[in-house]
Swiss-Prot record:
EC annotation from Swiss-Prot or TrEMBL: 1.4.1.24
Catalytic activity: 2-amino-2,3,7-trideoxy-D-lyxo-hept-6-ulosonate + NAD(+) + H2O = 3-dehydroquinate + NH4(+) + NADH + H(+)
Entry similarity comment: Belongs to the archaeal-type DHQ synthase family.
Name of the encoding gene: aroB'
Domain of life: Archaea
Protein name: 3-dehydroquinate synthase
One Pfam family linked to the record: DHQS
Length: 380
């Protein structure tokens, strides 16, 4: 899931107008705000967020210094005949050499500004580009020109609709958008669009249960998140990284206990959990870690661990076959622990039987420190 960032542009108008943009961004989950140097500390008083400032030095203490305003980038100064003579390029280079995180700001007026932006992108950590009239073509060209560089391209937009287009341009899209809008709903919608596009889908398939066996006592892990999950949502858990079961959240009421929709009673301490395109051991998770929440259609979203509970409980072995692959998971033996059935309906492990079909995720290759590698490995 490639993260798409949303920056809020708040460098014009009075402080009260800027403050409204910033607070809406903070409350909605924006990633960064772009302000003038004199407003950096004011932003920090409002909340904890990355602060970028238009400047040519780092006296403001901003997290990111953005070069280009009142320079060549926005057309205040003419573009140089040669890049080595550029006012903005030299300023960005000096800051980069000092270890400062630098953004380059360029307003695309014509092809010459597009070429200038590409040069800034080779120096800066972030390239903030916007247009006098919004067009996709300059963004496509810059993505193509800078695809081998480490720079992140942040494209200037004025609406959530423009943001969606920027995120989806070419295969990769912009890394983020710089939203210039004082409309609170537009800010919320843009951030929502970014988060939805981060939520890639993963392919799930059904496996046939071949064995259900009580094992006795062992240590199991509950993942309590800062997120509320729906029926059919949970996490991918298993004893093999090559194949994991969709374990349902405790989102259903039962005769014995109230629903805890923030929780996935995930499995024994040795188990793998799939997070993004990597795996981790359940037992190494801790508060503040990111996890991947997935539903029965394969749609993913990010969750945050609020607490991990490891307790001794009776365990149960679940074995299933998908094609010629045999998968296993060891879960707590309790009525409230459920796998997700083929049709998206949760099935309690207490009622699970041979022949039932449950949703799983299959992977090829092996894992080395959680990363997928091409290697033959047998896990039983």
């Amino acid at each position: 899931m490639k993260k798409k960032s949303v920056w809020i542009k708040a460098d014009e108008g009075g402080w009260e107008e800027q403050k409204e943009r910033i607070t809406t961004g903070l409350e909605s989950g924006a990633d960064c705000v772009l302000v003038n140097p004199g407003d950096v500390e004011k932003v920090r008083e409002l909340g904890n967020i990355t602060v970028a400032a238009f400047a040519r030095d780092n006296k403001s203490g901003a997290d990111i210094v953005v070069v280009g305003k009142r320079g060549e980038g926005d057309g205040t100064k003419p573009l140089p005949q040669e890049i080595p003579g550029s006012f903005d390029v030299n300023a960005a280079t000096l800051l980069t050499d000092k270890g400062v995180t630098v953004g380059g700001y360029v307003v695309i007026k014509d092809r010459s500004y597009e070429r200038f932006a590409a040069e800034m992108g080779k120096i800066c950590d972030y390239l903030l580009v916007t247009g006098t009239d919004w067009k996709v073509i300059p963004l496509e060209n810059l993505i193509a020109d800078l695809q081998r560089e480490k720079v992140k391209i942040i494209f200037g937009v004025k609406s959530a609709e423009e943001a969606r287009l920027a995120f989806q341009t070419l295969e990769t899209g912009a890394d983020g958008v710089l939203l210039d809008s004082g409309n609170p709903q537009e800010i919320k919608d843009t951030i929502k669009a970014a988060r939805e596009l981060e939520s890639e889908s993963t392919e799930l398939e059904s496996a046939v249960v071949t064995r259900v066996e009580p094992l006795g006592m062992g240590d199991r892990v509950c993942v309590d998140t800062c997120n509320l999950m729906q029926r059919g949502e949970g996490m991918l858990i298993g004893s093999q990284a090559s194949g994991m079961f969709l374990v349902n959240s405790e989102s259903d009421d039962s005769p014995y206990v109230a629903a805890r929709p923030f929780r996935v009673n995930a499995g024994a301490v040795h188990s793998y959990i799939k997070i993004g395109d990597k795996t981790r051991y359940l037992s190494e998770l801790q508060a503040g870690d990111s996890v991947t929440i997935i539903d029965s259609r394969g749609k993913q979203r990010e969750g945050i661990v609020g607490r991990i509970k490891i307790e001794s409980r009776p365990l149960m072995l679940i074995e299933a076959k998908a094609g010629d692959r045999t998968l296993t998971a060891i879960l707590q033996n309790a009525e409230t622990i459920k796998l997700v059935g083929k049709g998206g309906t949760p099935i309690s492990v207490a009622k699970l039987k041979k022949g039932d079909e449950v949703l799983v995720r299959l992977e090829e290759g092996a894992r080395h420190f959680g990363k997928k590698i091409e290697e033959t490995i047998i896990e039983k």
